[in-house]
């Protein structure tokens, strides 16, 4: 989904939506995410590409293939297919989209990455909570359990797909935004450890964290402080 302003040369923001369990809902999620990120920008000349990646019947992380393909299209084919000049490329993602852009940052350099409430951070913890009935069971953990067994039997397989396993080797500057009133068990229980791991990285480009009290999972889109930080991050790298 491409939102191309008038003109011939563009900086491009490639954005990734959050979790959508059914592929029939993906296009709407991509459109909503395009609108949400477009609303943060203070420059209408930026082209926004919203990626409608699949999720139905996939395990967490398997859709990195489609997420990467979209980025590579922007890098290598968008200019010729759209008849434009591509200048700088930025990535933005919310929730599972934040997970994907963080992982993409270990694979490909861009001009910068913004990840809001990225996750899942720790699938061992999350799926164990489902196994013991603390939180409601969901499809993602069920697929992992069918493939790997329980978190007790095979924790390393769950951790290998968790974002806490991708906290080094960031090839571009990244801004993490996190509302501190996000889900306590699913997100905030793992957030301090994730941040500590990232801040200990010795082979990452610049890393910034913005934590927002009183805000939840969609903090980036509900805070003037987050909006201003988002704009400052982009504008400093254009």
Spans of model-derived segments:
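Short substrate-entry loop that stabilizes the transition state in hydrolases
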Residues: 8-10, 18-58, 184
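Short beta-strand/loop motif that positions the catalytic acidic residue
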Residues: 170, 176-179
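Mobile cap/lid helix-loop segments that gate and shape the active-site cleft of serine hydrolases
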Residues: 118, 123-166
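Short beta-strand-to-loop junctions in surface cap/lid or active-site-entrance loops
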Residues: 1-9
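Gly/Ser-rich "nucleophile elbow"/oxyanion-hole loop immediately N-terminal to the catalytic nucleophile
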Residues: 69-95, 107
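C-terminal catalytic histidine-bearing segment of alpha/beta-hydrolase fold enzymes
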Residues: 60, 177, 184, 190-195, ...
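A conserved short beta-strand
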Residues: 109-120
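Short glycine-enriched nucleophile-adjacent loop
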Residues: 98-108
């Amino acid at each position: 989904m491409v939102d191309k302003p008038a003109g011939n040369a563009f900086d491009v923001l490639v954005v990734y939506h959050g979790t959508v369990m059914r592929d029939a809902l993906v296009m709407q999620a991509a459109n909503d995410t395009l609108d949400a990120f477009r609303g943060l920008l203070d420059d209408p000349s930026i082209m926004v590409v919203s990626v409608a990646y699949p999720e139905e019947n996939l395990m967490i992380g398997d859709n990195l293939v489609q997420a990467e393909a979209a980025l590579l299209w922007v890098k290598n084919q968008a200019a010729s297919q759209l008849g434009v000049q591509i200048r700088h490329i930025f990535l933005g993602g919310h929730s599972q989209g934040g997970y994907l852009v963080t992982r993409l940052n270990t694979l490909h350099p861009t001009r910068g990455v913004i990840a809001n409430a990225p996750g899942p951070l720790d699938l061992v913890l999350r799926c164990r909570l489902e196994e013991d009935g603390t939180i409601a069971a969901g499809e993602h953990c069920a697929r992992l359990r069918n493939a790997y067994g329980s978190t007790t039997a095979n924790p390393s397989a769950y951790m290998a797909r968790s974002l806490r396993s991708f906290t080094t080797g960031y090839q571009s500057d990244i801004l993490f935004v996190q509302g501190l009133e996000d889900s306590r068990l699913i997100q905030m229980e793992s957030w301090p450890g994730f941040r500590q791991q990232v801040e200990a990285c010795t082979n990452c480009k610049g890393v910034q964290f913005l934590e927002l009290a009183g805000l939840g999972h969609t903090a980036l889109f509900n805070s003037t402080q987050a909006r201003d930080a988002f704009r400052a991050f982009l504008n400093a790298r254009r």
